Amino acid sequence: MSKTSMQMGLDFTLVAEVEELVAGVDEVGRGPLCGAVVTAAVILDPNRPILGLNDSKKLTEAKREKLYDEICEKALSWCIARAEVEEIDELNILHATMLAMQRAVAGLHIQPKLAMIDGNRCPKLPMRSEAVVKGDSKVPAIAAASILAKVSRDREMAAFELIYPGYGISGHKGYPTPVHLEALVRLGPTPIHRRSFAPVRQAYEALEGLVQV
């Protein structure tokens, strides 16, 4: 998937009746050693409530999958965006995350009056923005964004498991678990690993040392 590719959805039916459009924005994948950082922006429809929204990490996989479909169906507008591994290595993970959030908001077909961002800092956006610490547990639109981002990234990690067997990617989703770290040492890094992250950098250095010998 290219760095500019996005998934989008919208429902114009009730846009005119909503006076204050608020987008929730969240990210998944800052901590993993491999794969893109994925973001989502969601504008919920107040006339089509979605029950059970919560921080995606607090939901079961089955519940997230169900809510993913419901969010895509009922939200006024939504967009899933990303920053690729190459961008993470070039910019650093913080700036790459901010870039991916900007892409998610820019991909909305309806411009919100306010963007509520999970965390303690906001990307530069053309509308008013507000950072909300633990926002995915407090703001429904942010919770919805966290679900879209996590389901999308988890699906991608499951696909990578087939391409790069032996790393356990579908289980740890790229996070630096003992299983992942051991595989990184044993098998070496893959093209989807983030060179700027210390364990990956050390794995490359170890390989280079072996080649020199």
From Swiss-Prot:
It is found in: Cytoplasm. Its cofactor is Mn(2+); Mg(2+). Keywords: Cytoplasm, Endonuclease, Hydrolase, Manganese, Metal-binding, Nuclease. SUPFAM superfamilies: Ribonuclease H-like. Its main location: cytoplasm. HAMAP family: RNase_HII_B. Belongs to the RNase HII family. This is Ribonuclease HII. The lineage of its organism: Bacteria, Pseudomonadati, Pseudomonadota, Gammaproteobacteria, Pseudomonadales.
